[in-house]
Each structure stands twice: as C-alpha cells, then as structure tokens.
Amino acid sequence: MTEKHLFTSESVSEGHPDKIADQISDSILDAMLEQDPEARVAVETTVTTGLVVVVGEVSTTAHIDIQKVVRETIKEIGYKNGKYGFDGDNCAVITAIDEQSPDIALGVDNSLEVKNGDVDPLDQIGAGDQGMMFGYAINETPELMPLPISLSHHLMKKVAEVRKNGTLAYLGPDAKAQVTVEYDDNNQPLRIDTVVLSTQHDENISLDQIRKDVMDQVITKVIPDKYLDSNTKYFINPTGRFVIGGPQGDAGLTGRKIIVDTYGGYAHHGGGAFSGKDATKVDRSASYAARYIAKNIVAAGLASQVEVQISYAIGVAQPVSVSVNTFGSGKVPNQKLVDAIRKVFDLRPAGIIKMLDLRRPIYKKTAAYGHFGRTDIDLPWEKTDKINELKKELDF
C-alpha cells in the first residue's frame, strides 16, 4: 500500500499587518539605498489602529522623508480614504532612528581578516552578526520551490490582482491563504487536499457571493486542474465574516512572517528576518546566497532537492561553516558539493554583495509574496547562471 502524507504551507497578502510592516521597512531601506548605496540600515516597523512606529539603527548620508515613505507605502497597498479602518494619509507616524552601534561597526567596517593583515578588499566587511542561514531548492515546480508555498503565494497574488483591477472590487487588502498538498511515498505531489482562503471584504457582500467569486476568479485560475479532485476541501472565509482587518484587526510587526518569506516550513530557517536590513546583515544576504547556491545545484541536475546551510561569526568575513543536505538525491558526494560551493561562490559578505549586486534599491518588491521563487520580478539570487561552473568544478 502506498503511504501518503500531507504538507501545508501558508501565505499572506500585502495588506496583512505584518506584511505592511515589512513593506514599510523595506521601502525605507530602498529610499536610503537610492541616495547612499553604502547605507547601513536596520529598520523595524510596527503598525496598529491609526499608528505606525518606525525604530532602528541607521548609518547613512541619505536624507529621506520617512513620513512620506511610510504614508505612500500604506496607500499603495490599499489603505486609503479611511475605508478599512487604516489610512495612509491620516495615521500617526512616530520615528525613533539611532546610528548603528560603533561596537558593531567596528567588526563590520574592518573584519578580523583585515585586522590580521589580509589585504583582499572583499575581506574588508565582516559579518554583521553571528548566525546560521539556510537556502533550499526542489524540482517539484518550475521555479524550484516547494509546491505548497508556491501555490499559496500565487493565490495571494491573484487575490491582490482581482482586488486592484476591479474584478472583485469589494475585497479588502488583508488576506491569507493556506494549501495542503498530498504526497506519495516518493515525496511526489499527488493532489491538493485542502485550500483555505480568507479575504477581507466590504460589509454589504454576502458570504455566498464571496465564496463563489473567490472560487471562480482565484482558486480555479491558480491551482492546476490536475491537482484538484472531488475530495479536495475548500474553506473560503470559514469564520463567515472578515470586514475588520489590517492593522485595525491585528497589530503588525516587521519580521513576523519569516516562514512565508522563505519556504513555507519545508526547509529549515535560521531565525533571522529579512526586511529593513541592508546587505551587510548576513541574515538577509547569506540567505539569498544560500538560495542562489541551492537553485543552481538543482538546476544543474546535481540533486533533485538540496538544503544549504551557511554560518558566520560577527566581525569575521569568511563563513564559519558551509554544509549541504541532498536528502539522498545527490549525484555527487555532499563533501564534493561543499568544496565546489566554496570555489564557485564567494560567501564573504562583501563577496555576496558583489556577486548578487545587493547595494541597489530592490527590496520593497520582495517584502510581500515571498523572497524566493519569484517569476514576476527579476531577482539576482533566482538566476541559474552558475550551472556550468558547478558542473565544471565537479566534472559532471
């Protein structure tokens, strides 16, 4: 008898309170990078009814209007005219921004390697913190992402599309989706077991209409027919009402959706959030590098799935460790993969920044609908341009 198992991942919309906070933090980061590509930025945002609070540490020559950036971001998401209990024009915005700690800057500006006499310019920047970061790729979708998180993101993007283009103009900005996939004993996706989708809506719309419209205009347009059958379960706005949402319904905070941002729980996570951080913070840049490595390994046919871990010590440029797990799917030994990774990819913070060109204002667009597997935007860590170098290094 074939043993089947279920796996579930979720995504949230750009109007979810935590995602509003992420987008504000990354909008501020982008605004600073536009003026000062060398800016050191660590910005955290919290949102609640009628209030946005922005705190953090910044070292930059940029002069930006944080109030304007915050308000424009909120309005772009869809919170304007007071319609959904939160309004970019009328909310209060409080900021408390300090300079980066000189003790941290001491290790980031001049790494341990430089202090010991190394002169390679890419050794200059030390890791901004200790920690471990993970990257993952699997060949079950064209973008080399796990199917549950991929479908969850696509559902949320479709909800935003039909809200903004007027197809379902009664929808509000806040929404969540969750997809449960049934796998066979070879870990191949068989079918969709359950779809959960909750979306904010205007008060005068009936639940029956919402359920029909979401089914017709979102779910059936996103999920391939081959995965749906008569036993697939759908829970559309299962509470029966979702009028109050966004920051009026729940407070939001930067960095609270790290699993949505990555692989939907399908792979490990080092715990560090991305949004609001410049590329000297390895929480962000090394996670992007790890995904870049993993995607190129799978795209090269060296494994059908792989998880890459990189770890750092604060103030030290070279990673403390690099490891891989191919879950038995590798075509070459793991140690050979690690050796090839170290030769093909420069994993010093300055090396990652150069390799992926990370001193650009490219981050706001990553702050909703996932940082990985994106086909709608051009992200450097999603490129598969290291395939030939990896194969050559491994004689594959």
From Swiss-Prot:
Pathway the protein acts in: Amino-acid biosynthesis; S-adenosyl-L-methionine biosynthesis; S-adenosyl-L-methionine from L-methionine: step 1/1
Region (Flexible loop): 100-110
Short name of any one Pfam family annotated for the protein: S-AdoMet_synt_N
Cofactor-binding details, from the entry: Binds 2 divalent ions per subunit. Binds 1 potassium ion per subunit.
Matching CDD domains: S-AdoMet_synt (cd18079)
Subcellular location: Cytoplasm
EC numbers for this chain: 2.5.1.6
Coarse class of the protein's main subcellular location: cytoplasm
Any single GO BP term: S-adenosylmethionine biosynthetic process
Keyword set includes Protein biosynthesis: no
S-S pairs: none
Top-level EC class: transferase
GO molecular function: ATP binding; magnesium ion binding; methionine adenosyltransferase activity
Catalytic activity: L-methionine + ATP + H2O = S-adenosyl-L-methionine + phosphate + diphosphate
Residues the record lists as binding Mg(2+): D18
Residues holding K(+): E44
Cofactor(s) of this protein: Mg(2+); K(+)
Chain residues that bind ATP: H16, D174, A175, K176, R241, F242, D250, R256, K257, A273, K277
Keyword Magnesium belongs to the record: yes
Record keywords, A-Z: ATP-binding, Cytoplasm, Magnesium, Metal-binding, Nucleotide-binding, One-carbon metabolism, Potassium, Transferase
Physiological role: Catalyzes the formation of S-adenosylmethionine (AdoMet) from methionine and ATP. The overall synthetic reaction is composed of two sequential steps, AdoMet formation and the subsequent tripolyphosphate hydrolysis which occurs prior to release of AdoMet from the enzyme.
Subunit structure: Homotetramer; dimer of dimers.
NCBIfam families assigned to the protein according to its UniProt record, in alphabetical order: metK
Similarity field: Belongs to the AdoMet synthase family.
Name recorded for this polypeptide: S-adenosylmethionine synthase
Native source organism of the sequence: Ligilactobacillus salivarius (strain UCC118)
